[in-house]
């Protein structure tokens, strides 16, 4: 399976069992996948989560999740929601801090 060369990111389910799923992550990098796997592993219902790349040049990374109970895709969705909220909060904090900084420095520049 050769790595797709499009700029758009997408997902493709490679295999699905009752308690496990493997998903190809097209045009996602290792940093995001490592963070996602770490968050998935915090879930008590998850037995195993990992990502791997068969060949770093020609293959897309794949994420594998096996659960003790529930649906594996639900564990992924929960982790994605948590990370989404985390990054949304981080973005809000940066925005507030930048506004505060600019406001403070505008006042000092005027004085």
From Swiss-Prot:
Catalysed reactions, semicolon-separated: RNA(n) + a ribonucleoside 5'-triphosphate = RNA(n+1) + diphosphate
UniProt-listed Gene3D superfamilies: RNA polymerase, RBP11-like subunit
Keywords (A to Z) from UniProt: Cytoplasm, DNA-directed RNA polymerase, Nucleotidyltransferase, Transcription, Transferase
Molecular functions per Gene Ontology: DNA binding; DNA-directed RNA polymerase activity; protein dimerization activity
SUPFAM superfamilies in the record: RBP11-like subunits of RNA polymerase
EC number: 2.7.7.6
Keyword rRNA processing among record annotations: no
InterPro entries given in the database record: RBP11-like (IPR036603), RBP11-like_dimer (IPR009025), RNA_pol_Rpb11_13-16kDa_CS (IPR008193), Rpo11-like (IPR022905)
PROSITE patterns: RNA_POL_L_13KD
Pfam families: RNA_pol_L_2
Function, as annotated: DNA-dependent RNA polymerase (RNAP) catalyzes the transcription of DNA into RNA using the four ribonucleoside triphosphates as substrates.
Quaternary state and interactors: Part of the RNA polymerase complex.
PANTHER family, per database record: DNA-DIRECTED RNA POLYMERASE I,II,III, DNA-DIRECTED RNA POLYMERASES I AND III SUBUNIT RPAC2
Protein name: DNA-directed RNA polymerase subunit Rpo11
Source species: Thermoplasma acidophilum (strain ATCC 25905 / DSM 1728 / JCM 9062 / NBRC 15155 / AMRC-C165)
Name of the gene encoding the protein in the UniProt record: rpo11
